Regions:
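Conserved N-terminal segment of class I S-adenosyl-L-methionine
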Residues: 1-100, 106, 123, 194-197, ...
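S-adenosyl-L-methionine-dependent methyltransferase catalytic module, highlighting the catalytic core
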Residues: 3-24, 51, 72, 117-125, ...
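Active-site acidic short loop of glycosyltransferases
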Residues: 38, 101-102, 118, 132
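N-terminal non-cleavable signal-anchor helices
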Residues: 78, 130, 183, 242-243
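A short SAM/SAH-binding and catalytic strip from SAM-dependent methyltransferases
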Residues: 106-117
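A short, highly charged, low-complexity intrinsically disordered segment
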Residues: 235-243
């Protein structure tokens, strides 16, 4: 599928307003907020309808002018721009980021990496625009989470894409695979935060207390939507070895 057709698919997808913030964003918030500083500049890649960006501005965690985001869907971008007119929201190509080098203190790549045809060059682009000691937060559907792996396989075998809303590109990844991929781009893995532990039908029953307890047991790598935190090495650190 061409990029134009992908964008058209997402334009149609975002015609409907998504009212609820994803569980991965809720899991991200405490750690992200603890890292924000008055001078922080934040970039979200694949922002969708901007749930986390709108939350951060509403709760006065960051200045609206310090927020930047791209998405390939013009429908999604226009939706967010109308709500955050002072932010730098634009349609864009993650393979050709048009920002200064080392500009952002924090980058977000939430539920996006699995939809990239070629994640390696995209991650290199993100690395280039991240400041030394800057952070990358990333989440994705983790197929070490066995209940969802079964649903995914059955949805394809039985030709039932609506079971999981299969998107134009929808790859299967696991935690070790993603960590290795991101570290090849030059980032260093720091921590994981678990999110969504049970099978999909039981998600409404997963309380914050239960999630916290499972994270305390360091089981985050088995959750369905883990949030991974990476850091770009500071000045003077060695560059990533070419693969």
């Amino acid at each position: 599928m061409t990029q134009a057709k992908e964008a058209a698919w997402y334009d149609e997808f975002y015609q409907q307003v998504q009212k609820q913030m994803g569980a991965w964003y809720r899991a991200l918030i405490p750690d992200l907020v603890s890292e924000l500083r008055p001078e922080s500049k934040l970039l979200e890649l694949g922002c969708g309808q901007g749930h986390i960006l709108r939350y951060l501005v509403l709760e006065k965690k960051i200045q609206e002018e310090s927020i930047f985001a791209i998405d390939q869907s013009s429908a999604a971008v226009e939706f967010v721009k109308n709500l955050l007119p002072k932010a730098g929201i634009a349609t864009g190509d993650i393979y050709r980021l048009e920002y200064p080098r080392e500009f952002f203190n924090i980058c977000l790549l939430m539920e996006t990496i699995e939809h990239l045809e070629e994640p390696a060059p995209a991650l290199k682009q993100v690395f280039e625009v991240t400041a030394p000691n800057g952070l990358l937060y990333l989440s994705f559907p983790n197929f070490l989470h066995l209940p969802w792996l079964l649903v995914r396989i059955l949805s394809e075998k039985l030709n039932q894409p609506n079971w999981i809303v299969l998107q134009p590109v929808d790859k299967i990844y696991t935690v070790p695979c993603v960590i290795k991929m991101v570290e090849r781009a030059g980032f260093k893995f720091e921590k994981g935060i678990g999110c969504s532990y049970g099978p999909p039908v039981l998600y409404p029953l997963e309380t914050p207390g239960l999630t916290k307890a499972l994270n305390a047991l360091k089981l985050w790598w088995l959750s369905f939507h883990p949030v991974l935190r990476f850091r770009k090495p500071g000045q003077g650190a060695s560059s990533p070895v070419a693969q």
